[in-house]
């Protein structure tokens, strides 16, 4: 399982479910839009602290960012 792709996919899905843009998450979290875009594409390897802060910005549990779902794209498991 590629954790970077899993986290990116989950982050993008949760962000969309909350109706937030990357710019809105940037304002809530302090992480740049460029960082968030790279994260969603699976190009970042966030620390545990970063996962926690991003989850807070989305209003979800940090566990939701690292848990595979039925919506996880094939190849990330």
Curated annotation (Swiss-Prot):
Keywords: DNA-binding, Plasmid, Transcription, Transcription regulation
Cited InterPro entries: Bact_TransReg_Diox, Cro/C1-type_HTH, Lambda_DNA-bd_dom_sf
Domain called HTH cro/C1-type: residue spans: 11-65
Listed Pfam families: HTH_3
A GO cellular component entry from the record: cytosol
Single GO term (MF): DNA binding
Chain segments annotated as transmembrane: none
Residues of the signal peptide: none
Residue spans binding DNA: 22-41
Protein name (database record): Uncharacterized HTH-type transcriptional regulator y4dJ
